[in-house]
Amino acid sequence: GRTPIILLDIPGTVDGNILMYGHLDKQPEMEGWEEGLGPWTPVMKDDKLYGRGGADDGYALFASISSILALKEQGIDHPRVLVLIEFSEESGSPDLPHYMELCSEKIGTPDLVVCLDSGAGDYKRFWTTTSLRGLIGLTMKVEVLTEGVHSGGASGHVPSSFRIARKLLSS
């Protein structure tokens, strides 16, 4: 079996398509908790909640729905919003490509993707991340000739396949 996903489709009042992505799985429990605190029983202490995953983006589903409700309460129009919540992000999202393909027609082409998963510099204040770097894996093959030639005899006449690859990757 595959890990589950939650896919919410919230109709919009204006054109557009937003995809909000988050996860609900957590890192494995850790050792080294203070006395009276631990991974399995949530504890309120000094107006803070302590427990496993308390600061690991468990808010994704709540935050996405709350943001749409806040817009509705204020009478602010919003585009269609799809909320995709997965349960295998901490394991490298092995099932996410399957679900993205399975749901591709429903998801369509988002105008904006909001990632509900980021880091925090400390636990004393709220943090907002406005952009993330992406990652892509690919196999690239650049061919410039049908047969090999010595660089001393073709340098300057034959384009460098490495230079072409660098140009493609930097575009």
Segments from the language model and where they lie:
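Acidic/histidine-rich catalytic neighborhood of metal-dependent amide-processing enzymes
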Residues: 55-131
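Residue-level signal for secondary-structure boundary sites
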Residues: 16, 28, 91, 122, ...
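Broad gene-expression machinery/nucleic-acid interaction feature
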Residues: 5, 80, 135-137
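Midchain, well-structured core segments that form catalytic/ion-binding scaffolds
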Residues: 97, 105-171
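Acidic/His- and Gly-rich active-site-bordering loop/insert found
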Residues: 1-52, 71-78
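Fold-independent oxyanion-binding glycine-rich loops
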Residues: 22-24, 46, 87, 116-119, ...
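Short, conserved micro-motifs enriched in small and acidic residues
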Residues: 49-62, 90, 155, 159, ...
